Amino acid sequence: MWDNKENHDVVGEKNECVCSGPFNSGLYAAMLQRGDVKGVFVGHDHINDYVGKYFGVYLGYSANTGFGTYGLSGAEKDRMRGARVFIIDQDDPDHFETYMVRASDYGI
């Protein structure tokens, strides 16, 4: 998805390799088959925060939320710390908004 950002409406940053599992479990195929999965968001890769749409399912990251783990290096080390916010309208749950907020936005 990252290598074809323009085709998948990717926004955000990729600062480290994707840490996917060692085998294909079929989870993504099962989500597609269900037809009602809107997105899957993870946070394991601490310095990635991008999101894009892949065959109708949003796949995305929330960057590192804590301060006791690795981040970017040097003066940038805490720049990506924060959390992903989701806004879901209960009257239209098929559509949502998501964005990152940074600890630095709150003086942390």
Where are these regions (language model features)?
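Short beta-strand scaffold positions
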Residues: V42-H44
